[in-house]
Amino acid sequence: MQAISLRKAINTLHLWLGFISGIILLVVAITGGILAFEDEIRNLTEHDLLYVEAQQKPKESVQHLLEAVREYNPKAMVTQVRYFGDPEKAAQVYTKDKKIYAVNPYTDQVLGVRDQEKNFMFLVLSLHRTLFLGHVGEEIIFWNACVFLVILLSGLFLWWPRRRKQFRQAVTIKKNASVKRRYFDLHSVAGFYVFIPMMFVVVTGIDMAAGGSSAPKKKSNVTEGIAFAASNYDSALHQSYHGEPVESIRITIPKDSNDVIGVSIRYETSSLRKQTAFVYDRYSVRPLSSDKWQDKTFRQRFFGSDYEIHTGRILGLPGKLVMFLAALITASLPVTGFLIWNGKRRKKRTGLKSGSPA
């Protein structure tokens, strides 16, 4: 009797949380499915801004890339510069007005500009992360992800077969079944198959939406009396990078006179992210701190790889495909859940009408 009451309570919780989060879950799942293949879509639609012809010479300095962008647009306020380990990839220069300048790293030529407020993939990403509602949207997405975690766990409880003999039926969509049964199978069985990938998605999603972990902010020492030079960016880069195979290198530009130079190096890996970050005084280029991937615990590296796990790219193309299919199936769950509920509601109404006095 207690087991039945518990099951009924969890079923009610599952139902109402589904009502609360269903529409948002639908939007987030569809956009998430698209973002699983973000790189492939960009390579097709933005190839000329992402790739250049590799040359047998060193890449240009950070200082020269900054000068090229400021010559192209004197009003550009640069926030970061990004190089890639792939010799055929263009460098990227980010600015405060949410634009990304594609620059040939061998010639300093500006190839073009992407506006993050108009670019299709950036709009999909913004919808996925904020629902186009800014900080309020970020909060909604965070709490919706927490709700979805409860939905997943309660759904697994409701799916779990009471007897071993029922297991095969619980993992199979019955053929030639009634419409009502088909809706139930599409919801219950499909939900079971996406449970594991969606657990990874929701746990990493919650961590990303919460902002992850951040180290205390360092400051540059303005009182040293040393004038700042643009070449300091390259000095910081040379102290940090010594020719190892990398996926990308990001140099963060100070926001003001007290801010620091940041250098973040993401090394090549086929597993959890290997990323080391260095912080330098912008005037003396004196090292202020470092956060090396070798010193991180498994948990730190796991959550440091949030994005790779969240999108499936940690397992390459197969991982992306799994997350894409899981996202599409997840998008269907609020729909099939509503159809199941609506079918029961209609049945109750029909029963009440047939049982009413003439």
Label each PLM-derived region with a short phrase.
Residues M1-A358:
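Conserved histidines in hydrophobic membrane contexts and catalytic metal-binding motifs
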